[in-house]
């Protein structure tokens, strides 16, 4: 068969495969949005959830999801930055570095439910944090740390070596070169990775069932005592997130309009995850143009 004809056939096959993937993804998104959007209202987004009566909302669960996301990022971003900088800038090739990379690969391949059980045994039981936001945040840190570390490392390695050489040629210390030259250059990629990880954290459920709990106690918005279980800023209270709420309503829910609540909650969750994903790309492009004057 003629080479040009083979090339056209191969191109058509590849386009068809890509089209099928896009069609499946678009169908899934449209199905969730079409089922859920009609049930979303302001009262649904801000109201309290109901255990037995119809008409409950997702206000507390939505707040818990964002609060848990913030706490997780506060813990995981510095750790991933430090690990990524070490691997990209300071680690020498050898058995120790290879062992660290192997550990990162193993952690990144663990199922979230296994990480959840690990978090339950260590943070909930052993450290006696109980079902709490801090237990969930620590478990999600273990879950996302490998991905975020690799993102930081890859972003730093994409910075051209001439940038480092220029800093060292000016007599700047190595750590100052990393902080003032390399990291600003790699910042768009790092920020994009963090925002994408935020979407993954926001939609996680399995790991949180065993660590953050499955209940959402009423919050006293005038109580700013961080140790109180009714305080909205307490990290030692149980916190059912939106993803866990969807799972609970579908598996154990007793409310009469469980299907409606689940559909609306799934649509809200999907919308925020899409915002994180598209926002990461826009923010990365903006920072790249801003910092590189491109």
Indicate residue ranges for each PLM-predicted region.
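Generic hydrophobic transmembrane alpha-helix motif, especially the helices
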Residues: 105-141
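Hydrophobic alpha-helical transmembrane segments of multipass integral membrane proteins
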Residues: 63, 67-75, 79, 83, ...
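Transmembrane alpha-helical segments of polytopic membrane transport and secretion proteins
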Residues: 1-18, 281-294
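Interhelical loop and adjacent transmembrane-helix boundary motif
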Residues: 52, 208-269
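Transmembrane alpha-helices
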Residues: 174-214
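Transmembrane-helix boundary motif in ABC transporter permease subunits
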Residues: 72-104, 125, 280-289
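Periplasmic/extracellular loop-to-transmembrane helix junction in inner-membrane transport proteins
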Residues: 1-13, 32-74, 93, 248-259
């Amino acid at each position: 068969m003629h080479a040009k004809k083979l090339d056209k056939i191969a191109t058509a096959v590849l386009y068809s495969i890509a089209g099928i993937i896009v069609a499946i993804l678009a169908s899934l998104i449209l199905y969730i949005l079409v089922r859920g959007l009609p049930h979303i209202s302001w009262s649904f987004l801000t109201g309290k959830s109901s255990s037995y009566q119809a008409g409950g909302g997702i206000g507390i669960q939505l707040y818990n999801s964002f609060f848990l996301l913030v706490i997780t990022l506060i813990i995981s971003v510095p750790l991933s930055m430090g690990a990524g900088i070490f691997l990209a800038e300071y680690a020498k090739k050898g058995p120790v570095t290879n062992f660290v990379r192997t550990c990162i690969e193993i952690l990144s391949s663990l199922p979230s439910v296994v990480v959840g059980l690990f978090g339950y045994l260590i943070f909930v039981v052993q450290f006696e944090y109980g079902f709490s936001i801090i237990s969930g945040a620590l478990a999600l840190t273990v879950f996302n740390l490998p991905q975020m570390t690799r993102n930081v490392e890859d972003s730093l390695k994409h910075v051209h070596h001439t940038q480092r050489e220029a800093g060292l040629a000016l007599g700047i210390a190595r750590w100052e070169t990393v902080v003032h030259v390399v990291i600003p250059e790699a910042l768009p990629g790092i920020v994009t990775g963090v925002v994408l990880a935020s979407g993954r954290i926001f939609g996680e459920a399995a790991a949180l069932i065993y660590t953050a709990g499955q209940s959402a106690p009423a919050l006293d918005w005038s109580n700013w005592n961080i140790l109180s279980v009714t305080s909205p800023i307490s990290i030692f209270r149980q916190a059912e997130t939106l993803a866990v709420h969807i799972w609970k309503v579908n598996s154990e829910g007793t409310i009469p309009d469980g299907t409606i609540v689940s559909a609306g909650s799934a649509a809200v969750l999907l919308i925020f995850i899409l915002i994180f994903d598209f926002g990461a790309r826009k923010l990365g492009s903006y920072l790249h143009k801003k910092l590189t004057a491109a």
